[in-house]
Amino acid sequence: MVFSSNVFLFLFLPIFLGLYYLSGQRYRNLLLLLASYVFYAWWRVDFLALFAAVTLWNYWIGLKVGAAGVRTKPAQRWLLLGVVVDSINVMMKSAGLEPFILTHVLLPIGISFYIFESISYIIDVYRGDTPATRNLIDFAAFVAIFPHLIAGPVLRFRDLADQFNNRTHTLDKFSEGCTRFMQGFIKKVFIADTLAVVADHCFALQNPTTGDAWLGALAYTAQLYFDFSGYSDMAIGLGLMMGFRFMENFKQPYISQSITEFWRRWHISLSTWLRDYLYITLGGNRKGTLTTYRNLFLTMLLGGLWHGANITYIVWGAWHGMWLAIEKAIGLNTSPRSFNPVRWAFTFLLVVMGWVIFRAENLHVAGRMYGAMFSFGEWSLSELNRANLTGLQVATLVVAYATLAFFGLRDFYTNRPAEKTKPADPSLIKAVPGDNPGSIHEPGFTVGQDAAVQPAYWTADWPRYAMRAAVLLLFVASILKLSAQSFSPFLYFQF
């Protein structure tokens, strides 16, 4: 089951929300757990055995680590055992092997996300950042909570533990959640799915022209953002409907003026996870300059490997790791107060080049695309491409980049760092390996929760209601479009 499907919109979600709000407060976590298991079992019922095993294992390991004491040798041994067992399936997936627990079943959808969350839980217990919970229902609901289950954000128990017991349910929060969900749905169905056809066709061409290659690269760059951030918006919106407030996962990443800044804004829950549980574990920046560069590179290399064993993901991770190390080495200002078009264009070029190899099935396809992009030969589209490209697809691509430019620049000038004479707000600038963690909001389409940092003209009542009305109309149009198209899963399902 996926969010962008009729069965979820018109069957699962209404039934769940109805039962949820009819239930008493003490039963809502149990109902959430059961609903999440139904959501997950929609793919394969036998996946639930693995799901339950992972949950019980990490619940037990957490108790053992907690009982052994913070950062003690016995706790370290329990932690190591927990991480090794948790990682078996992920490591076998990365190696291209069959998962260990379920014979003849591919690694279940979403396992990387809930394994990451389970590992972060037992590490936090070991470090003393959160106590080991004895409430099995709350812990199981945390692992299984369906809004983020398939493609994140990567949640942490220490951030949600209090919300499982003390979250609030208000009409404003529910309305905010509905708006956020609809925004994500529009991103996915209206924009990402339309651009997917363009990107797929361009990457499949055997002899692309320079124009074909750049069209495919730019279409995929926009598709991936609107697809993945759309899922995150829907997940965050669903959480708000249930009283939860999840961390933001995107903050207008394509406005970045460095790769370091890009990783503060892109897939924030994963980048902060890699920083807190991998980069810092490797030593961070505490063991000398060269070691810092090595740790940055290894963190991103392993981040690429997390996506799969395909050499393209590894090269993509190495590409980003290399530029992170270079920017660190030259002392680049990664929190600029002014917008520099040259720096932005160079950063965007690096990101697009990375997405080409990320999207390519193999190095041969990537080489074919790069060769066409930088041969600067025929800029016109091939006849095959012109025959398949529609006016709607072109218009969608233009609207996508206009949207990215408008909201990106608005975010930059609204939330840019303070003057050097004033201490910068770490919640706005810290979310990359080597820095301190921070919760970051993406003002992009968001209404309500970011009002404190938005200009007065944006938080006035009339534009808010006008935007919500526009979102509702586009949401209805997206549902009609969904009914007429074939099934289109989110891109990050494969990871």
From Swiss-Prot:
In Swiss-Prot or TrEMBL terms, this protein is called Probable alginate O-acetylase AlgI
Q: Which organism is it from?
A: Pseudomonas fluorescens
**InterPro entries xrefs:** Ac/AlaTfrase_AlgI/DltB, AlgI, MB_O-acyltransferase, MBOAT_fam
Which Pfam families does the record match to this protein? Answer: MBOAT
The lineage is: Bacteria, Pseudomonadati, Pseudomonadota, Gammaproteobacteria, Pseudomonadales
Q: Which domain of life is it from?
A: Bacteria
Transmembrane helix is among the record's keywords? yes
Main EC class the enzyme belongs to: transferase
This enzyme's EC code(s)? 2.3.1.-
| UniProt pathway annotation | Glycan biosynthesis; alginate biosynthesis
Q: Which GO terms describe its cellular component?
A: plasma membrane
Q: Where in the cell is it found?
A: Cell inner membrane
